[in-house]
Amino acid sequence: MKKVFVQLSLALALIACSGESIEDRLIEKPQIPQETPKTPETPKKPETPETPKQPETPETPKQPETPETPKQPDNPSKETGEIKVPLKLKAYYLGVDFTKTGNAFRNELAAHTIKKHHTFLGYGQRNQYLSKADADPAHRGNAILLYTGESRNYYASTVNTEHVFPQSKLSNAGQQKGDLHHLRACDKNVNSTRGNLPFTQGSGRARKVGGGWYPSDEFKGDVARMVMYMNLHYNLPWDRISTDGVKLMLRWNAEDPVSALEQQRNNVIEEAQGNRNPFIDNPYLATKIWGGNPAENTWK
């Protein structure tokens, strides 16, 4: 017992030296596990909001295709010459729309020319008018002969009447045969040599060229304007009269200007049968219809 007491006393002394109370020593404190403090998570950076997509640029609407320029009628005039009808001809051409071109203008001018042709002469009536139409102003009683340009008595036995558009190639021998606009005083032998040959290109004097007839440098424009009148009035085909169709007539119309004799004929024939050859009044009217070599616009 004494031994136990001594051991207990020693134990208490040790406790006293450690500074702990007897209750603390006797009551075992539960060990509170110490948590290792967690390293605080680095806060996430707020997500950068996505850059909003730019709205797609709408496609530039396609420009409507420029419509193709409608094709003009065959060989329309590319010229834009202004037409000013002379005062002395305004009454005659009243109602004609000179702003038109191509076939539209051809149809209008043809209708006007036909309407004005109110007196139809028989072929047997020609001399009383042609003797005035083809008269040589410098020599009373004489006529200027087609193709040669000679001045000769109109009623001479060596003179007869040339159909510039041959009778054998007319479609209506009656009315067309007596139309003064394509009848000319001519040397009988020259007329016979020409026969019904189509007109063709050449140079110099009137003569045969290959299978055609060249009317001379001096008269090729006269011939072209008479032939174009016959096409306009009667719609006679070009291949009956020219080896190069309307192109040759347009070339001659441009190269050989209207003569004083042609103007004289136009005035006399208007008095006789009512209508005029519009291509003598202004060669440029042919250019407005068929194009080709541009002729002089005498109505500016």
Where are the predicted features?
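Short, compositionally biased low-complexity segments
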Residues: 76-95, 193-205, 221
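Aromatic-lined ligand-binding clefts that engage carbohydrates, nucleic acids, or primary amines
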Residues: 81-154, 247-249, 269
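Short, Φ-rich (hydrophobic/aromatic) sequence segments
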Residues: 12, 102-113, 224-231
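Positively charged n-region of N-terminal signal peptides that target proteins for export
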Residues: 1-4
